[in-house]
UniProtKB/Swiss-Prot annotation:
<dbReference type="InterPro" id="IPR001709">
    <property type="entry name" value="Flavoprot_Pyr_Nucl_cyt_Rdtase"/>
</dbReference>
<dbReference type="InterPro" id="IPR017927">
    <property type="entry name" value="FAD-bd_FR_type"/>
</dbReference>
<dbReference type="InterPro" id="IPR001834">
    <property type="entry name" value="CBR-like"/>
</dbReference>
<feature type="transmembrane region" description="Helical">
    <location>
        <begin position="8"/>
        <end position="28"/>
    </location>
</feature>
<dbReference type="GO" id="GO:0005741">
    <property type="term" value="C:mitochondrial outer membrane"/>
</dbReference>
<dbReference type="InterPro" id="IPR017938">
    <property type="entry name" value="Riboflavin_synthase-like_b-brl"/>
</dbReference>
<keyword id="KW-1133">Transmembrane helix</keyword>
<keyword id="KW-0808">Transferase</keyword>
<dbReference type="GO" id="GO:0090560">
    <property type="term" value="F:2-(3-amino-3-carboxypropyl)histidine synthase activity"/>
</dbReference>
<dbReference type="InterPro" id="IPR039261">
    <property type="entry name" value="FNR_nucleotide-bd"/>
</dbReference>
<keyword id="KW-0285">Flavoprotein</keyword>
<dbReference type="GO" id="GO:0003954">
    <property type="term" value="F:NADH dehydrogenase activity"/>
</dbReference>
<dbReference type="Pfam" id="PF00175">
    <property type="entry name" value="NAD_binding_1"/>
</dbReference>
<feature type="binding site">
    <location>
        <begin position="150"/>
        <end position="182"/>
    </location>
    <ligand>
        <name>FAD</name>
    </ligand>
</feature>
<keyword id="KW-0472">Membrane</keyword>
<keyword id="KW-0496">Mitochondrion</keyword>
<dbReference type="GO" id="GO:0004128">
    <property type="term" value="F:cytochrome-b5 reductase activity, acting on NAD(P)H"/>
</dbReference>
Amino acid sequence: MSQPEPNPFIIFATVAAIISSAVAYYFFQLSRKNAPVLKPNDFQKFPLIEKTRVSHNTCVYRFGLPRSTDRLGLPIGQHIAIGATINDKEVVRSYTPISTDDELGYFDLLIKAYENGNISRHVESKKIGETIDIRGPKGFFTYTPGMVESFGMIAGGTGITPMYQILTAILRNPEDKTKVSLVYANVTEDDILLKEELNKMAREHPDRFKIYYVLNTPPENWTGGVGFVTPEIMDKHLPKASEATNLLLCGPPPMISAMKKAAVGLGYQKAKPVSKLGDQIFVF
């Protein structure tokens, strides 16, 4: 007996089903690779994979994501929460990564270890391979290209971290024409964090980014500001108040209080108790 000829329609349908399944699987895997890792309500463990000391009490800590193609999933301008049980108490503190979602497979935190800083000492104690608990994102500021024509920024100490993250996002995008002026205050020259990176940004983008350093205790032949950030320094080195300008602040509370008051004297709207996206003055 002769064998019946295969039904071409069945063959076509089978091949089409196989191809469709393969394509669907490919895009599923692709979406998994690019899916954000962070969960806003659940702490997850991330291993320390690298530690780079940048000053006597400050390090850049690099934490690994589950896959080398993962992104953290943190909008520019927002932060994460680190949680730990310390002396039988649950402690949570917020930090802004200095990396962005352009970096895949890891994220970087710049953390200064304070003598009485529970979480900062907790992170400092970690060895390579050990984990910390993180959740996020959190925060009320999200940067989008072109949201303003210019930013004025004032940072004190580790308050540089959200500024650096926003700066990186702006300057990496050749289509983003936002201009940034940063006043960065510290005690001594050795306390200036990310100085090489900031100076490189200023050299490579002189039309888009300018920085002015202020030190309480400057070395000899110092050409930057001396003492505290004053209204005169703000007026000279930051953009004038306008509807197209935002002022971003991050640093020690006494400094922030003084800067908010000085900003009003320079024509900025009074800062609100809790900053929201769209405020002319935003405090991280």
